[in-house]
Amino acid sequence: MKKIIIGNWKMNKTVSETRDFIQKFDIFYQENVGKIKEDLDFAIAPSFISLSLISKSLTKKLEIAAQNLSQFDSGAFTGEISGKMLQDLGTKYVIIGHSERREIFKEKDEELKNKILQAQKYDLIPVFCVGESLLEFEAGLTKKVIISQINAIKSVLNFQKAIIAYEPIWAIGTGKTATAAIAEKVCGLIKENFGKNTMVIYGGSVNSKNINELVSQKSIDGALVGGASLDPEEFGKILVNS
């Protein structure tokens, strides 16, 4: 199965900072393209105001990802961005169910199901995030939590055209990374329960130093990269080491 790397910028970088990133990334990519596997897919999920800038990159393999979308199709929903709008921009992937959206914005299963339906309606590939808290991990509840989170949306998700991102909450932005063995075990569990051809990636303090060990695992098909994707050279090195 092909590997994929998706950079999630969260609420970082202005438009001018995004332009600067793209210029520097393009230079790095052109200088190192021979070191990057030809079948590696990669994308960046910037803030909504910078989405269109990703398409200006000279690196034509660089795809656009969105960090979120509305559960509604169109209408009087102030501040929302629809799947149709994202499709029109050339967006390929959309992150749904990230733990920060679940915790801070209280997104529930029904809303996540509606977002998945909207994404699929407009041919966007959902990157559906699952993950357990430190308390759940230490209590040995990882399997129960992950299976439950996917079961909650499996009736609407087309697993053949989706990506499941395993992001243990205790490893997001903490500097702690699940060992490759732990990540492999959970990603393997997802494939076991929801189909061996389901694309499963890992997220949580991924960087250029640990990416190779992670993507070398049998059940890990790539990575959702947070802070390390904000630096053009570091993001480029992640691609090289994948």
Curated annotation (Swiss-Prot):
Organism (species): Mesomycoplasma hyopneumoniae
UniProt subunit comment: Homodimer.
Main location: cytoplasm
Keywords, ordered alphabetically: Cytoplasm, Gluconeogenesis, Glycolysis, Isomerase
Top-level taxon of origin: Bacteria
Annotated gene: tpiA
Pfam families cross-referenced by the UniProt entry: TIM
Entry similarity comment: Belongs to the triosephosphate isomerase family.
GO terms of biological process kind: gluconeogenesis; glyceraldehyde-3-phosphate biosynthetic process; glycerol catabolic process; glycolytic process
Matching Gene3D superfamilies: Aldolase class I
Active-site feature positions: 98 (electrophile), 167 (proton acceptor)
Residues annotated for substrate binding in this entry: 8-10, 173, 205, 226-227
GO cellular component, one term: cytosol
InterPro entries (UniProt xref): Aldolase_TIM, TIM_sf, TrioseP_Isoase_bac/euk, Triosephosphate_isomerase, Triosephosphate_isomerase_AS
Name this polypeptide is given: Triosephosphate isomerase
Compartment(s) where it occurs, according to its Swiss-Prot or TrEMBL record: Cytoplasm
